[in-house]
A protein has these predicted regions:
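Conserved ABC ATPase "signature" C-loop
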Residues: 218-219
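Conserved ABC ATPase signature
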Residues: 138-143, 147
């Protein structure tokens, strides 16, 4: 018997400018418990709008969204957001609050005792590979981009959510930092048993990190599946997205010698 999805979008639509712009157009999409789903698309595809609908940062015009089996329209929006981790592209840290304060903010709002928050902050700093003594009391402007993003991930995990939503989490980072952070979060996803939905415009990143990829364009869901399943899609846009990493891999293979080769 198939278990119910942890997140389910059913016939969801969202428009802006009085209906002139249909950002999400009749999208149905399920996310299974423990799955890492990447939603890929260009600017204006509706991918970020869909993510923001999941924790009621904005409200759908029609359709239904369930999280952990509950219709989110019946859940207090603030309470919903506090039980879902959210990672922003730039980290989204409060600039005048220390690293420890940023990480512990959701548990504090939930009324967690200070001693427990402090222990949780230390645990999370270890988890995201930031030295406690060195980074705990720093302000965000004293961190590199990669360090800020690691703090953002720690903050998203602070209240022990089952679900983490990530909006272009690695897009503003240099390639080496981006690669390392992606690998580290994938391991956190596995070891903590998370359900992750990541927004990205980069199909290569989606293929490398996610279990399954959904492709959006102009508010519509064009295709979804594993990379192997997507390769069988007859949609021209999906095919072009998949050809890009193939072309890049082929060019790199031609330009770079193999390890150990002269």
């Amino acid at each position: 018997m198939t278990s119910a999805p942890l997140i389910a979008f059913t016939d969801v639509s969202k428009s802006f400018d009085g209906g002139a712009v249909k950002a999400v157009d009749d999208v149905s999409l399920d996310v299974a418990e423990g799955e890492f789903l990447a939603i890929v698309g260009g600017s204006g595809s509706g991918k970020t709008t869909l993510l923001r609908l999941a924790n009621r940062l904005i409200e759908a015009d029609s359709g239904s969204i369930t999280v952990e089996g509950e219709d989110i329209s019946s859940i207090d929006p603030i309470g919903l957001r506090r039980r879902i981790g959210y990672v922003f592209q730039s980290g989204g840290l409060f600039p005048h609050i220390s690293v420890a304060g940023n990480i512990g903010i959701t548990p504090k709002l939930l009324g967690t005792p200070e001693a427990e928050i402090s222990a949780r902050v230390d645990e999370l700093l270890d988890l995201v590979r930031l030295d406690r003594a060195q980074y705990r009391d720093r302000l965000p402007h004293e961190l590199s981009g990669g360090q800020r993003q690691r703090v953002g991930v720690a903050r998203a995990l602070a209240a022990r959510p089952r679900i983490v939503l990530m909006d272009e989490p690695f897009g503003a980072l240099d390639p080496l930092t981006r690669d390392a952070l992606g690998d580290d979060f994938r391991e956190l996803h596995r070891s903590l048993g998370l359900t992750t939905v990541m927004i990205t415009h980069d199909m290569t990143e989606a293929i490398l990190l996610a279990d399954r990829v959904a492709v959006m364009r102009s508010g519509r869901l064009l295709a979804q599946g594993t990379p192997a399943e997507l390769s069988k899609s007859d949609d021209a846009y999906v095919g072009e997205l998949l050809r890009t990493p193939r072309r890049q891999a082929k060019r790199l293979g031609a330009l770079l010698p193999r390890d150990g080769a002269p």
